[in-house]
């Protein structure tokens, strides 16, 4: 049983916001890490970050090691089982955009293409490609594409031409 448009719109908004929050969290925390100079503070810092986004238990189960910046970036960006990760949220966003399209059948719609393109870009990303591109550039590129998706949602579903 499908829940309808309202449920899909609510989830599109939820996952758009969740992706942006995860990106912001990652950017802010990695920037503030540069001011730290002691391993005890750093370890405490990473634990608090993971607890605050609900990822501490998953991190411990997945990596079974001391805190590593690479592992944390991978968890928050690329883990498809962590509900606060960019990849998980993007997959959910894509699912709900597809459902909206099924319910509404809009005439001109690049939304499916745009969301699918971003989803595949992240699907074929790994930690090495993120590091090569730079975390800031990686995050900025995703934010730009999410803004385009958001604008397309407004254009397709909310923009009314008065005649």
Q: Model-predicted segments: where are they?
A:
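Alpha-helical transmembrane segments and their helix-helix packing motifs
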Residues: 1-163
